[in-house]
Amino acid sequence: MSYSAPSQITQRQLAYFEGKHVLIAGELNDNFPLELDKHCASTSIFTTNYGYYKQFSENPKINCYFGTELIEESHADMILLYWPKAKAEAEYLLTMLLAKLGKDTEIIVVGENRSGVKSVEKMFANFGPMNKLDSARRCSFYWGQCTETAPSFNLQDWFKEYQVQFKEHTIEVRSLPGVFSHGEFDKGSELLLQTLPSLRGHVLDFGCGAGVLGSVMKTINPKIHLDMVDISAFAIASSIETLKANGLEGNVFASDVYSDTKQNYQFIVSNPPFHAGLKTHYSSTEELLQKAPQNLTHSGQMIFVANSFLQYPPIVEKVFGHCNTLAKNNKFRIYSAQK
């Protein structure tokens, strides 16, 4: 079994976990919890990644929780935090989990050095001591303990509010840490919206993020039946809040690509992700494109934006027989294919 570099450095330090009830959170993307479970009293996972949740939710040995907050009761006395890409997300997870688990909770933090994991020393200062104990494979391993009473946690305090202007429309956006384009209007999404035709029927916004794309589409095309999906619990919560802030209606839910969609669509519209953590990641977008025809209605259309250097047209051509370029600039291209 091949583990990520942060998991490999953790594997060197299994003695720290002996007899502990460990709650794992953060940028975890391998099966290391199964290995860890052999060495500690119990293992549970809190994840904001729906795909990872589905991977472990059927495992009888490990309790796996998905969402923006740990709502369920937990007997964990140790947190293993895989440092996420966004510093604000790390701060969010630390604050939320320590508020839930309380004083005396031990915490181990692992992460790639280039991810900025070193900042945990300063970030954790108000909770208690935090010391670096190991480094290997360009990663660091920290141990700390919460010796102070953690402040109460309120999800609403973590939303960032900003406005997006598109033509004559002003969209109020509410976004949680770690959500794509947190605090700004993505230029790729803007070009996509400028290019879209009039929409009708059932429309899928794949990779909805903070809900900007879906909110603009619903504002301009109020009669559409809008589904908005994302793999991130932070994105789902953000999109729900953004729709609410603009008095709009849409069906927002977690889905690992098409895993939880229930119907075919007249339009699939997307600014698909290609970064997962610190690594460039294409697999979910490839699945989006490859399975699009079977998730579109007869004569349904897929329209998406991508960075110019990404080689998506051959994938689209293979499944649709064609791929049209509707618009482009020096950074992005808008592609379209019709069933």
UniProtKB/Swiss-Prot annotation:
Its main location: cytoplasm. InterPro entries: DNA_methylase_N6_adenine_CS, Mtase_sm_N, rRNA_ssu_MeTfrase_C, RsmC/RlmG, SAM-dependent_MTases_sf, Small_mtfrase_dom. Coiled coil: none annotated. It catalyses: guanosine(1207) in 16S rRNA + S-adenosyl-L-methionine = N(2)-methylguanosine(1207) in 16S rRNA + S-adenosyl-L-homocysteine + H(+). SUPFAM superfamilies: S-adenosyl-L-methionine-dependent methyltransferases (SSF53335). CDD domains: AdoMet_MTases. GO terms for cellular component: cytoplasm. It is found in: Cytoplasm. GO terms for molecular function: 16S rRNA (guanine(1207)-N(2))-methyltransferase activity; nucleic acid binding. Keywords: Cytoplasm, Methyltransferase, rRNA processing, S-adenosyl-L-methionine, Transferase. It comes from the Bacteria. Specifically methylates the guanine in position 1207 of 16S rRNA in the 30S particle. HAMAP family: 16SrRNA_methyltr_C. This is Ribosomal RNA small subunit methyltransferase C. The gene is rsmC.
